[in-house]
Amino acid sequence: MDGMIAMLPAPLQQLSSHIDFQGQKVAERTYQVILTLAGIIGFFVGYSTQQLSYAMYTVMGAAVFTALIILPPWPFLFRKNPIVWQTPIEEQEASSSSDNEKKDKKKETKKTK
């Protein structure tokens, strides 16, 4: 993804391209609803006019409309719930705590035997 962003012009590289997990859920649901409705509407348009091309144009137009709504990471739709990451622990603390955990596990297994 970073390689694709690097190919963009400089002003576009400044835009954020990430959405949060809740935003992904909203985007997926919006995509499903719009395209399902477009399929139903396209079917009736094609049936009433007896033109398959009208049905296809209806669905393709809805697909373009959906892409315009879903693809940009709109901050008011898809980035409302940012992910809060835990701060990384230092290596010494991590290794000493994992050593202590291993010792505790060994003690527990000896006690149970």
From Swiss-Prot:
Pfam families linked: SPC12
Q: Where in the cell is it found?
A: Endoplasmic reticulum membrane
Bilayer disposition of the protein: Multi-pass membrane protein
The protein's UniProt keywords, in alphabetical order, are: Endoplasmic reticulum, Membrane, Transmembrane, Transmembrane helix
Topology feature Lumenal, residues: 54-57
Instruction: Extract the ranges annotated as region (Disordered).
Output: 89-113
What's the main place this protein lives? endoplasmic reticulum
Q: Which residues cross the membrane?
A: 33-53, 58-78
What GO biological process terms are annotated to this protein in UniProt? protein targeting to ER; signal peptide processing
Q: Which residues lie on this side of the membrane: Cytoplasmic?
A: 1-32, 79-113
Q: Superkingdom of the source?
A: Eukaryota
Report the InterPro entries cross-referenced here: Spc1/SPCS1
Under the cellular component aspect of Gene Ontology, which terms does the record hold? signal peptidase complex
Would you identify the family this protein belongs to, as annotated?
Belongs to the SPCS1 family.
Please describe what this protein does: Component of the signal peptidase complex (SPC) which catalyzes the cleavage of N-terminal signal sequences from nascent proteins as they are translocated into the lumen of the endoplasmic reticulum. Dispensable for SPC enzymatic activity.
SUBUNIT field: Component of the signal peptidase complex (SPC) composed of a catalytic subunit sec-11 and three accessory subunits spcs-1, spcs-2 and spcs-3. The complex induces a local thinning of the ER membrane which is used to measure the length of the signal peptide (SP) h-region of protein substrates. This ensures the selectivity of the complex towards h-regions shorter than 18-20 amino acids.
Q: What is this protein called?
A: Signal peptidase complex subunit 1
**What is the organism of origin for this protein?**
Caenorhabditis briggsae
